Regions:
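Membrane-anchoring alpha-helices and their flanking helix-loop junctions
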Residues: 2, 10-221
């Protein structure tokens, strides 16, 4: 039995199995948060504190807070359109905290922070425009109607954002000089190649999707 109100359905006889799955998903979300905190704490050893807390661990917490905050209106509106841009906001916020935690940021840290920002902005805006043009992301058909499952997806994104940027954040926080760091230039070249490849691939896929003849097909070359 159910009562529909403003698009939501409240069951008068809750299913115990469904409640069990909901609890598991919520616990999984907190487990993912705990993983980020543990890695953040371990990576903070020997590094600076921010507001008396281990720097990298605090930054990880901010990333999850941003994801969980934007999850609330996303679930209420049953929309996935802000999922990817949430990652972009988290990337930029986390990098920003790392940058402003130091009074005198070395050029090395400045460049890495800039690379994070450029990459996150480019990808996030591209995905945001695409989902609004297409109207939906098919991955979220069933997920976005479930509070606990949608929360897990946002939590996984938060962990992914932190893990993929943890090394760069550590570099910024440690704030060492660029002088004599050959690995930095090797990494910069790899980043430039990867960024150019990603931009090219996204443009090829955009043109593929805009071609009506390819409707329902998957791009397999490029």
């Amino acid at each position: 039995y159910g009562l529909s109100h403003f698009g939501y359905t409240f069951k008068t006889k809750p299913d115990s199995t469904s409640q069990g799955k909901i609890m598991i998903n919520i616990l999984l979300s907190f487990f993912l948060f705990a993983i980020a905190l543990i890695i953040g704490y371990a990576g903070s050893q020997g590094g600076p504190n921010i507001f008396s807390y281990p720097g990298l661990m605090l930054i990880a917490s901010v990333g999850f807070f941003i994801h969980w905050l934007i999850f609330i209106p996303s679930y209420l509106l049953k929309t996935e359109k802000y999922y990817d841009i949430t990652g972009t906001i988290a990337y930029m916020a986390m990098a920003g905290i790392a940058v402003f935690s130091s009074h005198e940021l070395h050029l090395r840290s400045q460049i890495v922070a800039l690379l994070i920002t450029v990459w996150a902005l480019r990808l996030g805006l591209f995905l945001l425009v695409r989902v609004f043009q297409v109207g939906e992301d098919k991955r979220f058909h069933e997920v976005k109607t479930s509070f606990s499952r949608f929360l897990v997806w946002f939590s996984m994104s938060a962990l992914w954002v932190f893990l993929t940027t943890a090394n760069a954040l550590t570099l910024i926080l440690n704030n060492t000089s660029l002088i004599g760091d050959g690995y930095f230039f090797i990494g910069l070249i790899i980043w430039l190649i990867g960024f150019a490849t990603e931009v090219t691939a996204d443009e090829q896929k955009r043109r593929f999707r805009n071609n009506a003849e390819n409707n329902g097909q998957f791009i397999n070359n490029g």
